[in-house]
Amino acid sequence: MAAIELIDLKKNYGPVSAVKGINLTVADGEMIVLVGPSGCGKSTLLRMIAGLEAISSGHLRIAGSDVGHVDPADRNIAMVFQNYALYPHMTVRQNLEYGLKNRRVARGEIERRIANAASILEIGEFLERRPRQLSGGQRQRVAMGRAIVRDPAAFLFDEPLSNLDAKLRVQMRVEIRRLQRQLKTTSLYVTHDQLEAMTLADRLVVMNGGRIEQIGTPIEVYRRPETVFVAGFIGSPPMNLIDLDQLGPCQLALPRDTDVIGIRPSAINLGSGSAHDLRFDAFVELIETVGDENNVHLRIDGADKRVVASISTNQPLQEGDRISCHVGMDGLHPFNRATGRRTD
């Protein structure tokens, strides 16, 4: 196990800057999840750490050693890919032992590591099968097993669950988190799926346009997004972002330079509320039922602005209703549009 340090790490493709000066420290044994939309630079950054992409400038340290120009095989890290990357003509056992044989690990040690990985991942009964005889989830377990037997300083996960169906993704997500906590191996995990990110991470790193927007625990990032981008990206349904001038005259005690407020759908309540609340009337345009809640799509009365509210299915609402809504001051997130940042 080892800490990973990224110091002003940059990646350029000719005149295009894909990764723009990343500074990040992953503590020994920590699980960091890089999350962001397609093209934000998260996978490029992971490949730079793995050694699959050259670093344009900056420093990469693993366990205190600068490895930015060290061959990938010598960085003592293991990577788990989206497409499993298993050899189809080999059995599971042969896939697990292949890298160890190439590094001339002793036969007894190879057997010990394979037995340990098979026990942890519950794949012992599959050791003599070939990948085509396994389900998607079983293949992903084998891919993780191949990483475990290397006994690396760190794991790198590149969207490993993207090829699985929804039910299996949930199951494998739990298994990856359990495995990481059991092994206490420093881990970096890349995903565009915010639910995956929120449930797996010790800390989230939200990326956008090759830069870090915010670093924090999942609950910190959710409860206090530092930028307009993070506010609109983290959360499902996403946070409603409303320009103050779309609300008309209102008496709210907001920080100076606030011209945008963010409101979580769960913070919108039915009824007129109190004089200190943000209050508005709205028309119900669409109701989406998702379990115990409805995602209610509203058009604010007198404004060309639509918002989404998460309302209990016990509330008798119908499309076409005109309703009164309120949001307490603790449910308002103040931002400045020009800077893109919080004002409080």
Curated annotation (Swiss-Prot):
The enzyme's E.C. designation: 7.6.2.10
Broad class of the protein's primary localization: membrane
ABC transporter domain location: 4-234
UniProt topology in membrane: Peripheral membrane protein
Cellular component terms (Gene Ontology): ATP-binding cassette (ABC) transporter complex, substrate-binding subunit-containing
InterPro entries cross-referenced by the UniProt entry: AAA+_ATPase (IPR003593), ABC_transporter-like_ATP-bd (IPR003439), ABC_transporter-like_CS (IPR017871), ABC_transpr_MalK-like (IPR015855), ABC_transpr_MalK/UgpC-like (IPR047641), Mo/tungstate-bd_C_term_dom (IPR008995), NA-bd_OB-fold (IPR012340), P-loop_NTPase (IPR027417)
Compartment annotation: Cell inner membrane
Biological role: Part of the ABC transporter complex UgpBAEC involved in sn-glycerol-3-phosphate (G3P) import. Responsible for energy coupling to the transport system.
Protein name: sn-glycerol-3-phosphate import ATP-binding protein UgpC 2
Source species of the chain: Rhizobium johnstonii (strain DSM 114642 / LMG 32736 / 3841) (Rhizobium leguminosarum bv. viciae)
UniProt gene name: ugpC2
